[in-house]
Amino acid sequence: MILSDQNFLQTQWKEPQTAQSKNTESKCEFHGNSNEVKPIGSLNGQSIAQCRIHTGKTVPIVKGGEQARMEENEIYAIETFGSTGKGYFHDDMETSHYMKNFELADEKIPLRLQKSKGLLKLIDKNFATLAFCRCWIDRLEETKYLMALKDRWMAMVGACILQSFAGKIIGKRANLLLNLII
């Protein structure tokens, strides 16, 4: 969404009550059980740019978040996440997804091993600088890169070629993560 309405531009994201009340009041039925859906307050919408997410500003889905102003011609991904778990995301767990470092998007990256080069080429072709998880490499049926993944993955993170993001929804074993439309 590109914003250009001057009245809307003056709005601060102080209290996004609609998102919070919709999340808090929601229930979902799963396998015959009714579950309360709680907002995951630490997962926010964010400003985005072409082939780049997380460009600086966030849009909270619960009260008390960051108070930033939207500027004209900025683009945002407004995401409202809810969970049947405890309603928070623990980000110091094992890595859940990766992104290629945007600053290196157009640079030739010197890698010594052929499998590492092949893995990076696969990432460039299929994901560029957008987020992906390791199982998506499996789904591409690129089994020849599985050893490179295991052996070279953390080396690529350590060399700042890939950024790693960790996290897990906290709660019951069978949590549901819902991306709610409000």
From Swiss-Prot:
Q: Tell me the superkingdom of the source.
A: Eukaryota
Query: Which residue stretches belong to region Disordered?
Result: 1-33
Where composition is biased (Polar residues), the residues are 1-23
Family affiliation: Belongs to the peptidase M24 family.
User: How is this protein named in the record?
Assistant: Putative uncharacterized protein T27A8.3
Q: Name one GO molecular function term.
A: metalloexopeptidase activity
GO annotation terms (biological process): proteolysis
List keywords of the entry alphabetically: Aminopeptidase, Cobalt, Hydrolase, Protease
- Identify the GO cellular component terms for this protein: cytoplasm
